[in-house]
A protein has these predicted regions:
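Flavin-dependent oxidoreductase catalytic cores
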Residues: 1-332
Length: 332
């Protein structure tokens, strides 16, 4: 059996999201949620082996605990990539068995692997043997016509027997044809009862629930049935919710920070990035939702969106955007 992360570090996590959870996003999320486990975007095993590792794997020390999510279906390649990821300092290596996109299917990885539990088990066994870091799996309830809990349970049992002790379960199945990745996050019905049943029947496994968890109450109440929750789009589009979830789960006696306080704590990182030549637009895109639903929220987004493409834009742009929200708050 692979090592398991410390239980308190898997109670709350932020999902791996392609094109979103890059290193700039993860540092921002760490400021919002000091106790959450963060995940990289999915990286194909071959890219880890052959690609620019600093670009693909580099992360800031503040991100710990942080997991590297791998895609692939070749056990030898996944083993090599897992070892590389562990050597880079990642706290967990996660195998993606949940992404339903056409591109991913064409490469024979992601959700389509739920049809091949023995292959997934072979991949996991190779990864566990190669990696000193814990190896975990993120999966769905099934794909296409799979409608039977027993098939899902058999998949989990097969992969667990290869050494995986933690499963992040997106509580929907995926349709491999006919639905876009976005539709696959929304149209297939949520079946939390399957995930709850899995935890009851396999109490030896660490089970993290993913899918449809958008509020503090949703997330906290889910912990009565599973070991942890993983938040996806809600954490990105309305990041202040992530801060409130972290507070509610870990430090309920502490008042949440104000949005402006949280953003100003990001300043040293932003200025360090600018000093290294990183364009501010790569950073500001991750903070656009911080004032969602608040006075001045639309103006905040507008100031950032209009100013970020300028090559000389820096922290002063973010301060100008903050000033707009503070004026609106005073007026209210």
């Amino acid at each position: 059996m692979s090592l398991l992360p410390a239980p308190e570090t898997t109670r709350l996590s932020v999902a791996p999201m392609m094109d979103w959870t890059d290193r700039h996003c993860r540092v921002f999320h760490r400021l919002l949620a000091p106790h959450a486990r963060l995940y990289t975007e999915m990286v194909h095993a071959q890219a880890v082996i052959l690609g620019d590792r600093d670009r693909l794997l580099g992360f800031d020390a503040v991100e710990h605990p942080v997991a590297l999510q791998l895609g692939g279906s070749d056990p030898a390649h996944l083993a090599q990539a897992s070892r590389i990821g562990a050597d880079w300092g990642y706290d967990e290596i996660n195998l993606n068995v949940g992404c339903p996109s056409d591109r991913v299917q064409a490469g024979r990885f992601g959700a389509c692997l739920m049809r091949e539990p023995s292959l997934v088990a072979e991949c996991v066994a190779a990864m566990v043997a190669a990696s000193p870091a814990p190896v975990t799996v993120k999966c769905r309830l099934g794909v296409d016509e799979m409608e039977d809990y027993g098939v899902f349970r058999a998949f989990i049992d097969t992969v667990a027997s290869a050494g995986c002790g933690l499963f992040v379960v997106h509580a929907r199945k995926a349709w491999l044809q006919g639905l876009s990745p976005k539709e696959n996050r929304e149209i297939p019905p949520l079946r939390y009862d399957w995930v709850h049943q899995l935890k009851r029947e396999r109490p030896d496994l660490r089970i993290v629930l993913n899918g449809g968890l958008a509020t503090v109450d949703d997330s906290v109440s889910a912990l009565a049935h599973v070991d942890g929750v993983m938040i996806g789009r809600a954490a990105y589009h309305e990041p202040y919710r992530l801060h409130l979830m972290d507070r509610a789960m870990f430090t309920p006696g502490l008042a949440p920070w104000e949005r402006g306080q949280l953003l100003r704590a990001y300043r040293p990182y932003v200025e360090d990035c600018r000093a290294r030549g990183v364009a501010v637009k790569h950073i500001t895109r991750h903070i656009l939702g911080l004032f969602h639903g608040q006075p001045g929220g639309r103006a905040f987004r507008q100031v950032l969106s209009e100013g970020a493409p300028r090559s000389d834009a820096g922290w002063d742009l973010i301060e100008r955007a903050l000033a707009v929200t503070e004026r609106r708050e005073d007026a209210a």
